[in-house]
Curated annotation (Swiss-Prot):
Keywords: Ribonucleoprotein, Ribosomal protein, RNA-binding, rRNA-binding. The keyword Ribosomal protein applies. This is Small ribosomal subunit protein uS4. Coiled coil: none annotated. PANTHER family: 30S 40S RIBOSOMAL PROTEIN, SMALL RIBOSOMAL SUBUNIT PROTEIN US4M.
Length: 202
């Protein structure tokens, strides 16, 4: 399953607030479609599937990528759900979003893919790059790159930068100073349900 490129508000109407996907709030609180307002009891599978979809759409990863992250999270030991969230939070596109360099995760991914971002002094155009403690993330010293980031920083997607990231706004540089903790994840998600969803599939 490829990365979603359709109407974002349609997704948020179905899944709820996804801060990484879009800034806009859905005007209607019920799911889209002819039967969107109908009340019916959902199965446990449907609930787990919805939580998985929240994770996939918020971070903008394909089903195949998410499966790989689940396998990696499981191999790390400890809480698979927490490990999974940390892996997604440490993606370079998400880190750029949390810093305010991009308005959303898709916007930040575009910033990375187009070569506007450096890590430790080198251009990194791979959105899935795993940021780690000590990494210095910066916007390239080019006028178009700086203008893009400066514009986005005026209206960041999220109000607060998590404590494991330090931003020097005037220099358009930041540093990863620690590990991302579960409570700093902006998305409202029950990651245990995601792990349960994949328990028989992965």
């Amino acid at each position: 399953m490829s990365r979603y490129r359709g109407a974002r508000l349609r997704v948020t109407r179905r899944l709820g607030d996804l801060p990484g996907l879009t800034r806009k709030a859905a005007k209607r609180s019920y799911p889209p479609g002819q039967h969107g307002q109908a009340r019916r009891k959902r199965s446990e599978y449907a609930i787990r599937l919805e939580e998985k979809q929240k994770l996939r759409f918020n971070y903008g990863v394909s089903e195949r990528q998410l499966v790989r992250y689940v396998k990696k999270a499981r191999a790390q030991g400890g809480s698979t759900g927490t490990n999974l969230l940390k892996l997604l939070e440490n993606r370079l596109d998400n880190v750029c979003f949390r810093l305010g360099f991009g308005p959303t995760i898709p916007g930040s991914r575009q910033l990375v893919n187009h070569g506007h971002v450096t890590v430790n002094g080198r251009v990194v155009d791979i959105a899935s790059y795993q940021c780690k403690a000590g990494d210095v993330i910066a916007i390239r010293e080019k006028k178009p790159s700086k203008k893009l980031a400066e514009t986005n920083l005026e209206f960041p997607g999220l109000a607060n930068i998590p404590p494991h990231l330090e931003l020097e706004k005037s220099k358009l540089t930041a540093k990863v100073v620690g590990k991302c903790e579960r409570e700093w994840v902006a998305l409202e998600i029950n990651e245990l349900l995601v792990v349960e969803y994949y328990s028989r599939k992965v």
